[in-house]
């Protein structure tokens, strides 16, 4: 058997991982500006954490979860999304306690797992970035969180991103709309896909979210959720729209958007862009005021979003956005002869401790091959170290661009390498 990675997974190799690190650093730095702190939860959870919160009728639970019984016969699932684990942690660790500052803002970056058909930007193990804000029902929280996503795309230079917006209202509004949707769809039940027929009585809003052609056709003239919002729900949505207008963030009201998870209420949103004439959602989220109490905590308003790193990097690539990845080293040490091996090790360590990036030859190659490696590594400076340099405790260093050379004592190199770089015009 040829040993290979499982279908739907990937190896992120050196070089490619530098792009990931750059994007992740941009994300972390931006989230700090909005006062979000990182949370890290387990990669696997009890099955009920996901099934009960995400929704028993969702595709995630019915088709896509990786779940198993462990040796203690506990029903376990690899996490398919990040919000439910964070809410579980919020309740379990009593972060709702009065001594914890509100709103509580957290973000995560990590692997998620769904059994899906692998395609560009969608894998069975994928990496998700998410933010969760607990304790504020102010519409400004909705807008600030959406604006943070918008801010991220601006920082990365991503173009042609459209914000789609909708409201699911409060539970009373949603229930009234649910019944209206059942009344509309029941007479045309036979025209729906098999999945949507099954969902019609369990969760008819799922039909709006279906990608099946027959379902899309069936809901074209379906009633709009916005016609069923009560006064408080309408006021919340109006405030969100007004604040987005004030921040000059354009949006499209999309009444067929319901999101793929059952725990949302009030504001929901997606950021969508086009790749090769195909629409691609790159960030999505909304308000979920009932989820904390569902996990046994107190009534707590909450808002958040998730975005896929694979999709984000795919879009950056397709839009031709080059990331400023640093791929240089400060010094390459060419080592000539076994006598210089220990000295090269000693000098390299001393320079690294001063905060510089150093590589050296380990393979005893000819000098020409070593110089070629220095060029491959984009070394700013080359040091050529042999037995005579070891004896004299002095060595020549060369600026790899200007070819300027200086001769410096080992002592100076080990104590003040920055002054050596200045002598070379660096």
UniProtKB/Swiss-Prot annotation:
EC primary class: ligase
Record protein name field: Histidine--tRNA ligase
GO cellular component, one term: cytoplasm
UniProtKB keywords: Aminoacyl-tRNA synthetase, ATP-binding, Cytoplasm, Ligase, Nucleotide-binding, Protein biosynthesis
HAMAP family reported in the protein's UniProt record: His_tRNA_synth (MF_00127)
Broad class of the protein's primary localization: cytoplasm
EC number: 6.1.1.21
Chain segments annotated as coiled-coil in the UniProt record: none
Biological processes, Gene Ontology terms: histidyl-tRNA aminoacylation
InterPro entries: aa-tRNA-synth_II, aa-tRNA-synth_II/BPL/LPL, Anticodon-bd, Anticodon-bd_dom_sf, His-tRNA-ligase, HisRS-like_core, HisRS/HisZ, HisRS_anticodon
Lineage of source species: Bacteria, Bacillati, Bacillota, Bacilli, Lactobacillales
Similarity field: Belongs to the class-II aminoacyl-tRNA synthetase family.
Gene that encodes the chain: hisS
Keyword Ligase included in the entry's annotation: yes
SUPFAM superfamilies for this protein: Class II aaRS ABD-related, Class II aaRS and biotin synthetases
Domain of life: Bacteria
UniProt GO MF annotations: ATP binding; catalytic activity, acting on a protein; histidine-tRNA ligase activity; transferase activity
Compartments it resides in: Cytoplasm
Record text on subunit structure and interactions: Homodimer.
One Pfam assignment: tRNA-synt_His
Organism: Streptococcus agalactiae serotype V (strain ATCC BAA-611 / 2603 V/R)
Catalytic activity reported: tRNA(His) + L-histidine + ATP = L-histidyl-tRNA(His) + AMP + diphosphate + H(+)
């Amino acid at each position: 058997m040829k040993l290979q990675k499982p279908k739907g997974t990937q190896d992120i190799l050196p070089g490619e991982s530098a792009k990931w690190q750059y994007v992740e650093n941009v994300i972390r730095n931006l989230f700090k500006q909005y006062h979000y702190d990182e949370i890290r939860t387990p990669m696997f959870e009890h099955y009920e954490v996901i099934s009960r919160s995400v929704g028993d009728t969702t595709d995630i639970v019915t088709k896509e979860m990786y779940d198993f019984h462990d040796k203690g016969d506990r029903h376990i699932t690899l996490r398919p999304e990040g919000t439910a684990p964070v809410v579980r942690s919020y309740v379990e660790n009593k972060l709702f306690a009065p001594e914890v500052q509100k709103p509580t803002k957290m973000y995560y970056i990590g692997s998620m797992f769904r059994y899906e058909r692998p395609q560009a930007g969608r894998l069975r193990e994928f990496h998700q970035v998410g933010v969760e804000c607990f304790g504020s029902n102010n519409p400004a929280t909705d807008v600030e969180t959406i604006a943070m996503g918008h801010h991220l795309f601006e920082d990365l230079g991503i173009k042609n991103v459209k914000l789609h917006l909708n409201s699911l209202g409060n539970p009373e509004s949603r229930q009234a709309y649910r019944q209206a949707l059942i009344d509309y769809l029941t007479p045309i039940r036979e025209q729906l896909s098999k999945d949507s027929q099954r969902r019609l009585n369990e969760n008819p809003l799922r039909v709006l979210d279906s990608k099946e052609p027959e379902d899309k056709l069936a809901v074209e003239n379906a009633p709009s959720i916005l016609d069923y919002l009560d006064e408080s729900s309408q006021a919340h949505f109006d405030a969100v729209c007004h604040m987005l207008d004030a921040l000059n963030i354009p949006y499209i009201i999309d009444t067929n958007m319901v999101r793929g998870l059952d725990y949302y209420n009030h504001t929901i949103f997606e950021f969508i862009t086009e790749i090769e004439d195909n629409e691609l959602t790159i960030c999505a989220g909304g308000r979920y005021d009932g989820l904390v109490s569902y996990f046994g905590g107190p009534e707590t308003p909450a808002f958040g979003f998730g975005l896929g790193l694979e999709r984000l990097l795919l879009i950056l690539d397709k839009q031709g956005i080059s990331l400023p990845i640093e791929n240089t080293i400060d010094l390459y040490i060419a080592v000539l002869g076994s006598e210089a091996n220990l000295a090269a090790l000693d000098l390299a360590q001393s320079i690294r401790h001063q905060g510089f990036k150093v590589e050296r030859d380990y393979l005893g190659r000819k000098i020409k091959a070593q110089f070629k490696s220095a060029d491959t590594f984009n070394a700013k400076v080359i040091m050529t170290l042999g037995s005579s340099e070891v004896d004299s405790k002095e060595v020549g260093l060369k600026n790899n661009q200007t070819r300027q050379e200086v001769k410096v004592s080992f002592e100076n190199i080990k104590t003040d390498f920055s002054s050596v770089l200045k002598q070379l015009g660096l």
